Structures are given as structure tokens and as C-alpha cells.
Swiss-Prot record:
Pfam families: GARS_A, GARS_C, GARS_N. Mg(2+) 2 binds at E288, N290. SMART domains: GARS_A, GARS_C. Mg(2+) 1 binds at Q276, E288. Pathway: Purine metabolism; IMP biosynthesis via de novo pathway; N(1)-(5-phospho-D-ribosyl)glycinamide from 5-phospho-alpha-D-ribose 1-diphosphate: step 2/2. This is Phosphoribosylamine--glycine ligase.
Length: 436
């Protein structure tokens, strides 16, 4: 079977790796990712425009497509491929609004009484926004309605001093159309521990994957600006050290009810659904959805997949998804990023990766926003590569992953604290304090 994987990052490298033993991989990339290039052979094309992607897929006789990035979903690539007779693992443009339109997502929860929602309002009038914020007695979270690459959300107490500073930023979101829409979502700030559950969906049923915790802050100790994700970890039981089985099942139930609601609103949601939750004292609260695999979270779960990825993809597009099994291993993923990331990452700097030594350690290399020219690899201004270590427990995986970073040379940095006992135990104590 011929499968086209759209996307250029470490997430797509992981998707290609999961499919490579069962299918012939074709690739559409924005830059020459060395890991994807290796798996796709000569069957790749460097482009982004939807009509050219569809033409390329048709000319190559592709049987199925797997869409990685959200921008292609918002652009309607799945719809265009389906019109050409090519089914896709990825929702239609309308169904993808669960990610691309935050007001749509919150209204869906309201209309269908899906549990796990939080207090919110959507504004497009700066004066109405000002009146609301003057009386809003919770700490505010400001979210552009549209896509911002994971970097548009600002939270009082983290990035903003108080609700008046939140008002200033929210007004800017409206006036400058940050996220592509002249509107903004204001939500109450929920205190707890964030976690992610990803699920395969055939439009009727979802098959959940192990829970993961991402680390979006740029610097150690959860400090600094929000990034696309500096790394993540998962545990051997599919839960997290602070997450109970009931918490996990409640999150999965929220996701299943969401897929049911989307089906009634837009038609079947076929693809990957990513739920970002805040585990509060009252249980899981839905923070946001992504309409595709998380990056880095995809790299925690895909190396553990025991089931056939090809059969899962076929089940998604055919509407008869069955099940998926995962190895009982923990994982730690650490991103190596250019100096200055995320504000002004060093671009064009050469990096050297001793993949053989990393592989011999049992650690996996996934290339991200780098560009290969001949036998040399150069950074862009974004994340360069991810290292993923599977092991029997989180702390063993962390030690292995950290040791492997020594085999990557260049003007890069990473968060050394992800997956460490100190940071994980801090999460556990935080939840214990909240629940008591």
C-alpha cells in the first residue's frame, strides 16, 4: 500500500517510522527532514500548496494519506484529497474546527452538555470585552480563536500580571486578528496538572492511547515562554504518576462524547483526536483539542504501538476501527532546540548527530525542523530533533535519554529536568495538595 504522509517534523518522522514496515511511504515536506527522506526514499516533494499535494498524490497512485500538521487540515486538504478519491487519516476542514476554532469547541461542549468544560466567553467587540473583564473575578486565560502554533495562549499568573494586563492582550488579539480571527476567548484559569490523552477515531468509536505529560515552557523548572513542547513522558501502566484510572477513564469519556457531538454537527471525525486536560481537584477539565497527533506526544506513544499501524489507519478511514495495544513501557522524550528558541532560534547552524551510538543505547532519534543538504544537517529557528527513550520506568528512561543527548553536537539546548524524579514528584505532591 502507498501512503502519503504530509508534514515535515518529528511527529511526521514518527508516523512514517510506524508505517514504514507495512507500506511504501510518500512524503510532502516543507524542508528536507533527513529521517523522513530516508524512509520515503526518492518519493518526496517539497511543497505546501493543497492543489499540488492532491496532484502529486494522484500521480503517484497513493492509496491513503496521513495528515500531520493542523494548518493543512484547516486549509481543507482532507476534503480535497477525498474529492480525488484518496481517503485520509485526518478530519475534514469542518470537523477540524474542534482545534481551529476554539469558540466552536466550547459551544459544542455547551450544546451537548459534555462534562469537563469550564467558564468561558467569546468576544469580538473590545468594549464588551472591557466591561466583562472589569467584573471577571477569576484569573483569566486569553486564547485567540484560531491557530497560533501553540504560542498564542497567555495566562494570568504565568505570562500576564493580572486581568487588566489580560484585557490589554485580549484587545490586541481582536484588533490585530491574532490567530486569523477578529475575536478572542476568555476562560477561567483552572489549577491542576496538565495531561494529554490521544485517541484514534473512526467517527463512531475512539481507541485511546497511553496518557502523556508535555512540558511547554522553554526553560527548566517550568519557566520561560510557551513553546511547541520541549519534551514529554509517559508511564508503563498507560497512566501518569499523579493520574488515576478513573481520571483517565473520565477523560476518555469526554473525548468519546465529543466525537459523538462532532458527528451530529459536521459528519464523522476520522483521524487522531488529542485532548489536553487539566486534572483539577474536581477531575479532568478540557483545556483544548488538537485535530491531530501532538508533537512531542506522538513520539511517546507510537514507539510503543504493538498493533499494526496500517490496520489502524485502514480502520479509521473505513469506519471499522477495532483496537490497539501498546507495550507496557515508560518513555521520556527530550527536544533539542536551537539557542535562542523560541523567540530567536539560531538558524543555519550545522549539527552533528551520532545516530549509531544513540540507537545502540536503545534511544530513538526523530528529526524535526532541520534541513539536510548533502550529508550535512542544519537548524532552522524551530525545534531541531527529539530523542525518545523507552524503559521499564520513567526515571530509567530519563537517565537513558539524558545520556543520549551527549551524542548530539551543535548550538542546541534542552531541558534536563523532564522526566526527572524531582520534577515528577513535584507534580505528584501538587495533586495531593489539591485533592486534600
Amino acid at each position: 500500500m502507498k501512503i502519503l504522509v504530509v508534514g515535515t517534523g518529528a511527529r511526521e518522522h514518527a508516523i512514517c517510522s510506524a508505517l514504514a514496515d507495512e507500506a511504501t511511504i510518500y512524503s510532502v515536506m516543507g524542508n528536507r527532514n533527513p529521517g523522513i527522506s530516508r524512509l520515503a526514499g526518492n518519493s518526496l516533494l517539497l511543497l505546501k500548496l493543497t492543489p499540488k499535494v492532491v496532484r502529486f498524490a494522484s500521480e503517484k497512485g497513493v492509496d491513503m494519506a496521513f495528515i500531520g500538521p493542523e494548518a493543512h487540515l484547516e486549509a481543507g486538504l482532507v476534503d480535497a484529497l477525498e474529492e480525488a478519491g484518496i481517503p485520509s487519516v485526518g478530519p475534514t476542514r469542518d470537523a477540524a474546527r474542534i482545534e481551529t476554532d476554539k469558540s466552536f469547541m466550547r459551544k459544542l461542549f455547551e450544546d451537548y452538555r459534555i462534562p469537563g468544560s469550564i467558564t468561558y466567553r467569546v468576544f469580538s467587540d473590545p468594549e464588551e470585552l472591557r466591561e466583562f473583564m472589569e467584573d471577571f473575578d477569576s484569573e483569566a486565560v486569553v486564547k485567540p480563536v484560531g491557530l497560533t502554533g501553540g504560542k498564542g495562549v497567555k495566562i494570568v499568573g504565568e505570562h500576564l500580571r493580572d486581568n487588566m494586563e489580560a484585557l490589554k492582550y485580549a484587545t490586541e488579539v481582536i484588533e490585530k486578528r491574532i490567530g486569523g480571527h477578529p475575536s478572542v476567548v476568555i476562560e477561567e484559569r483552572v489549577v491542576g496538572e496538565e495531561f494529554t490523552v490521544q485517541a484514534f477515531s473512526d467517527g463512531e468509536h475512539i481507541v485511546p492511547m497511553p496518557a502523556v505529560q508535555d512540558h511547554p515552557h522553554a526553560y527548566e523548572g517550568d519557566q520561560g515562554p510557551i513553546t511547541g513542547g520541549m519534551g514529554s513522558y509517559s508511564d508503563s501502566d498507560g497512566l501518569l504518576p499523579f493520574l488515576t484510572q478513573k481520571d483517565y477513564e473520565d477523560a476518555v469519556e469526554i473525548m468519546q462524547r465529543t466525537v459523538d457531538a462532532i458527528r451530529k454537527e459536521t459528519g464523522p471525525y476520522r483521524g487522531i483526536l488529542y485532548g489536553q486536560f487539566m486534572l483539577s481537584a474536581d477531575g479532568p477539565k478540557l483545556i483544548e483539542y488538537n485535530a491531530r497527533f501532538g508533537d512531542p506526544e506522538a513520539m511517546n506513544v507510537l514507539p510503543l504501538l504493538e498493533s499494526s499501524m496500517l490496520e489502524i489507519c485502514e480502520g479509521i478511514v473505513d469506519g471499522n476501527l477495532k483496537s490497539a495495544s501498546f507495550m507496557n513501557l515508560a518513555t521520556v522524550c527530550k527536544y533539542l532546540v536551537p539557542e535562542g528558541y523560541p523567540e530567536s532560534g539560531v538558524a543555519g547552524a550545522e549539527i552533528k548527530v551520532d545516530e549509531k551510538k544513540i540507537e545502540d543505547m536503545g534511544v530513538i532519534t526523530y528529526y524535526a525542523a532541520v534541513n539536510q543538504e548533502d550529508d550535512h544537517i542544519y537548524t532552522s529557528s524551530s525545534r531541531a530533533l527529539a530523542l525518545v527513550a523507552p524503559a521499564d520506568d520513567i526515571y530509567s528512561a530519563e537517565e537513558l535519554c539524558e545520556e543520549a543527548t551527549a551524542h548530539v553536537k551543535g548550538r542546541l539546548y534542552h531541558r534536563r529536568d523532564i522526566g526527572t524524579r524531582e520534577l515528577v514528584e513535584k507534580r505528584i505532591k501538587h495533586m495531593e495538595d489539591l485533592r486534600s
